[in-house]
Every structure is written in structure tokens, then in C-alpha cells.
């Protein structure tokens, strides 16, 4: 896998550029109604050149190829990793840290998050299963089996 910092930067660039494209008309007409963080994202996205976006999209495809090659070379059907670096946050102010999901989301690989118990404070913990690109149905089959195993404490 390439440098994680590069993956994060690429992901943010693509996210901003696509947000600017998708919201172009509505933002022009109703920009004053947008949340400040969305305004910042759209304005950043407007600054992304076609060349920068193309390079980021190519990097995303390269990451997907690298992950697929790793799976092929090691006979992996899926990856299993934590959903987040810790338990879910208390309250609704935050959805938590996306660090554990970002590489998979960026590469376009399907993910399923599974309940994996509670921490000492009673907050939920999770695992995510990551499947091969365009093999969502196989991931769902694996995830159903994993869910049963996790529920049994295994």
C-alpha cells in the first residue's frame, strides 16, 4: 500500500473536486444556505485542476490494483480490521475517526462494519470486513458468517 498520507491527500482532493462539481448549480443559487464546512470543501474543490484530479484518480486506481495484488498473492478473500481506532464516540457530536475506513473507501473496495462487543464504558466496538473490488455479494456472504461468529463470542 502506498504512503497513507498520500492516500489521505488524494482522497480529500477527489472529495473536494467532486463536491464542487455535484453542487455547482445549487451552490451558485443557494450557497448562503450551506454549512460552513461544506462551503470550504466546495471552494477547495473549485481550485482543483483537471490534471490534479486525473492524477488523484489514477493514484486511486493504482492503490486498488496494489490491494488486489496483495489479496491474490496471499490467497485472501477479505481483509478484517478494526472499524475505528477505538470505541464509538459518546453522543452525536462526532461520527468518530475515519482513519481505518479511508483506504478502503478511497480504493472503492466494499466494506461491511460488524458489531464486535462493547468497551469498558459500554460503548460499541466494531470490525470491518473488506472485500474485493466489485465482489460486494461475496463480502456480504462472508459478513453474514462473521456476524454469527462474533455474536457467539468467537
Enumerate the language-model features and the residues they cover.
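Generic non-transmembrane alpha-helical segments
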Residues: 66-73, 99, 145-153
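Short helix-loop capping/hinge segments that flank enzyme active sites or metal/cofactor-binding pockets
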Residues: 13-64, 68, 113-126
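Conserved acidic residues
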Residues: 77
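Small-aliphatic-rich amphipathic alpha-helix that forms the alpha element of a beta-alpha
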Residues: 66-69, 92-115
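Gly/Ser-rich, acidic/histidine-flanked active-site/gating loops
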Residues: 1-11
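Short, surface-exposed loop/helix-turn segments at secondary-structure junctions
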Residues: 11, 55, 73-74, 83-102
Amino acid at each position: 500500500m502506498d504512503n497513507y498520507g498520500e492516500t489521505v491527500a488524494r482522497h480529500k482532493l477527489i472529495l473536494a473536486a467532486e463536491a464542487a462539481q455535484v453542487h455547482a448549480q445549487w451552490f451558485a443559487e443557494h450557497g448562503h444556505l450551506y454549512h460552513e464546512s461544506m462551503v470550504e470543501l466546495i471552494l477547495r474543490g473549485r481550485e482543483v485542476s483537471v490534471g490534479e484530479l486525473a492524477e488523484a484518480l489514477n493514484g486511486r486506481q493504482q492503490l486498488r490494483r496494489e490491494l488486489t495484488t496483495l489479496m491474490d498473492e496471499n490467497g485472501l478473500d477479505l481483509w478484517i480490521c478494526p472499524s475505528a481506532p477505538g470505541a464509538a464516540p459518546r453522543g452525536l457530536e462526532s461520527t468518530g475517526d475515519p482513519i481505518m475506513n479511508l483506504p478502503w473507501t478511497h480504493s472503492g473496495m466494499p466494506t461491511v462494519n460488524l458489531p464486535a462487543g462493547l468497551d469498558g464504558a459500554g460503548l460499541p466496538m466494531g470490525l470491518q470486513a473488506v472485500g474485493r473490488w466489485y465482489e460486494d455479494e461475496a463480502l456480504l456472504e462472508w459478513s453474514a458468517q462473521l456476524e454469527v461468529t462474533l455474536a457467539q463470542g468467537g
